[in-house]
Structures are given as structure tokens and as C-alpha cells.
Amino acid sequence: MEESMEEEEMLTYEAMMDDQNHNNWEAAADSFRQPPPAPPLPPPPPPRPSSSIPDPGRELPGGQLLAVHAGSMERKGPKEGLPMGPPPLPEPNGVIMMLKSCDAAAAVAKTAPAPTSSSTININTSTSKFLMNVITIEDYKSTYWPKLDGAIDQLLTQSPGDYIPISYEQIYSCVYKCVCQQHSEQMYSDLIKKITSHLERVSKELQASPPDLYIERFNIALGQYMGALQSIVPLFIYMNKFYIETKLNRDLKDDLIKLFTEHVAEKHIYSLMPLLLEAQSTPFQVTPSTMANIVKGLYTLRPEWVQMAPTLFSKFIPNILPPAVESELSEYAAQDQKLQRELIQNGFTRGDQSRKRAGDELAYNSPSACASSRGYR
């Protein structure tokens, strides 16, 4: 009896479970068959208040679209226009499409505000600042050129190796500003006049020199001027690059060397050359370094002057004379012998040509020297 009752209870329990599962399956199937309920529609937007908040979807003057949901404007916090409530419900399709058309852009462009007076004021301010930096011709003559004039004076009159208390950076900056302000032509003209006046004064001083000091003073003037060019040319490099080379098709260094040639060398070459030839015939009347500096300097100024004294120039500059030929060897030997005789006549003796010094033979032949030499062996 008990077993039969237990079996009936088990069957009843299984039947109840089958009915419950069947009901669940039918409910699930019905849910798949029926479409989902539509989401609730958002509440209608309230009337727009009269404030500075732009309309949703309205294009700003900058060309950007501002999309603001109406629900986000219903509640306002401490500051106007800040959304404080919950986020709005999404649209049925989940996407907000914003298209910008040409007509809308044109309409916004027409309604854009005109440029205010502040922009005009800014432009005028920048223009006035630029005009304040303009260097007029009066500024150039009263401020900039006096600085350059004083520096050029010091460079032209300095001795080799002297220290000049001038600011190369300041002079370089003055030249740069004058070139940028279109004063290159005036500055080049002033530079040429300045150096020409200096060279004319140097030429007059050389003319008043006595013959025994003429060569030495010419050497000092030549070396001083060439040394000054090594500083003047770099200081005026902007003028040389943007005016002399571009418009005049010349070079500043060549122009300044030409000035010395025209105002000093050409006026004194016919007085200087006889003195150089005379000094050459008398050994050590002029130091070799002075003679070499003058001869090389004259060749740099004008190579055609070699024809005035080719033998003199050939002693300091290579490849001046034509190459030697075998038929002239006897003549070369005669010239060397003549030079040796002249040296002997001026007190230069040949002396002992052996390799031993005076007293060496006596020292080596003495017994002490022999004993010491054996000791080192």
C-alpha cells in the first residue's frame, strides 16, 4: 500500500511539473511572436524662454551646429542653461542626423555680425608699432652712421695686434638694420667716402717721408690697411650680400683694395720701386720680412707691376720668371758668383766649410777625451 501511494505521488508531481514547463514555453513563444511595445514618447517641449540660449539645431556664426535636446533645458541649476535633470530619452531610431546645407550656410553668413571696431583698432596698433621701428634718413645720419664712422676710424688707425674697445655686435646690428630699412646705397656711399678720405691723408704722409724711412712707412701703411679690411668687410657683410653683389655685381673687398691701389699705390709706385731695387743690391739694408711684405702686397694690388722689376718679384713670388733652360746655366752660375763676391765685400766671410767646430779636433785628440770614450764603451 505504501509503495503504491508513493508511486501515485511521484506521478502527480511529474504531471504538475510538466504543466508548469508547458505554460512557460507557451509564454516564451508568445513573447517572440508579438512585437515589442513602443517606448513612451518624450514630453512636448515647453515654450522657449527669452534667453541667450541658442535654438536646438541652430547654426552658430562660427559655422558649427549646436544640437540641444529640449528636455535638457527644462530644469536649470544655479547657472542658466546647465542641464540638471536626467538625460533625455533616445529617439526611436537612436541617431540624431544633422545636415548642413549650402542655403543654411549662406543664410548664416548674411546674418553674421559685421567686424567690430576692436579688430580695426588692433590692425592700426600693429601698424603704428611697425612705423615706430622705421629708420628714416635723418635717423640714419644722426644715430646709426656716427657709430659706424667711429668704428671705421678705429679699425683703420689701429696697429697690428692692438685691442680696440668697440662692440662688433653693435656695429653688425647697425649695418643689418640699415640694410633692412633700405639705406644700403647711402651707407655704401658713406663708407667709400670715409675710406677714400683716410687713404688720401695716408698718401700725403708718405709723400712727406724721407727716403730712408719711405720703404718702412709704406710697409706700415699697407699692412695696417690690409689688416683693417679683415674686420671691415665682415662687419658690412649684409650690405655686401644684398646690395653690392646683387645690384652692383661687385665685391666689397675688391672695391676697398682698389681704393688703396688708386689713392696710394699708384701715386707712389714710381718712387718706391727704385728704392726697392737699391735696397735689393745692398744686403740687409731692408729687413727681408719688410721686403717680402711690400713685394707681395704690390703683386696683390696689381700683378702688372711685375714687369717693372721681374727679378725682384721672382725672389718672393714663385713662377714669375720663365722656366730655366740649359743654355743659360752658365749665366745663372755667374750671377751666383757675383752675389758671393758682393757678400764678401760687405764683410760676410765664408769661414771654415768643414763640419768640425773650432777646438773639436783638439778635444778629441786629448788623452782625457780618449779615456772618457773608453769608459763609455
Swiss-Prot record:
Gene3D superfamilies found in the cross-reference section: Cullin Repeats
A Pfam family hit: Cullin
GO biological process: G1/S transition of mitotic cell cycle; positive regulation of cell population proliferation; positive regulation of protein kinase activity; ubiquitin-dependent protein catabolic process
Keyword Cell cycle among record annotations: yes
SUPFAM superfamilies listed in its UniProt record: Cullin repeat-like
UniProt-annotated stretches for the region Disordered: 1-63, 347-377
InterPro entries: CACUL1, Cullin_N, Cullin_repeat-like_dom_sf
Extent of Pro residues compositional bias: 34-49
Keywords: Cell cycle
A GO term for molecular function: protein kinase binding
Stretches with biased composition (Acidic residues): 1-11
Subunit structure: Interacts with CDK2.
Family recorded in the similarity comment: Belongs to the cullin family.
Functional note: Cell cycle associated protein capable of promoting cell proliferation through the activation of CDK2 at the G1/S phase transition.
UniProt name for this protein: CDK2-associated and cullin domain-containing protein 1
Lineage: Eukaryota, Metazoa, Chordata, Craniata, Vertebrata
